[in-house]
Amino acid sequence: MGMDQSAILQEYLEAKDNRIIRIEILGGEFLYAIQVFLSSGEFNLCPADYCKPSDEPQSFNNTRLDDPNTTNRAPVASFNPPDQIIENARRIMTASNIEVGGVEYLINESDGLEYYYDINALSNFVANPIEIVGFDPFPSLVDFVVSRANEPLAVTL
C-alpha cells in the first residue's frame, strides 16, 4: 500500500498466439505496427536492441543500436492491425496528448478481447526497420520534430 493507502492490482492476461502488438503513432497518424513474440518465462517485450538483458555483462559504450547482429531484442514481425484497433490507438494517444509513441495491446487468450496495457510517450523503434516493416521510420520522426520546432510558440500571459 502506498502512503495514501492506494494500491494497484494487476492481473496476468495470457496473450493469444503468444504475442503482443505494438502500434507506433507519429503526429496523430499510424506509422507502423509490429507483433512481438513472447518467450517462455520472460516479460521483456521491448523490440529495440538495448532493451533485452543478457546473462553476460554488457558494455553499451561500443554497442550500436542499429546492429543487425545483436541478440538483445525480442523476436518481432510486421503486423497489420484492423482499422478499428489503429483508430483506438490514435484516440488513446490523442487523449493522452502524446504526439509520438506507441500503444501496446494483446488479445486475451481466455475471452478474445483486446486489452491496451501500455502507452509509451517515446518510440522504441523496431531494430532493422527496413527488414521488419519495410521502411526506416527515423526520417519521418526527424521531419516531424523539425516541423514542430519551426512552429511558433503560443505564450499565454
Language-model features, listed with the residues they occupy:
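Phosphate-binding site of ATP-dependent enzymes
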Residues: M1-S96
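C-terminal active-site "lid" helix and adjoining low-complexity regulatory extension at the edge
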Residues: F79-N80, T94-I98, I107-L157
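Hydrophobic residue at the +6 position relative to the catalytic HRD Asp in the kinase catalytic loop
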Residues: V103-Y105
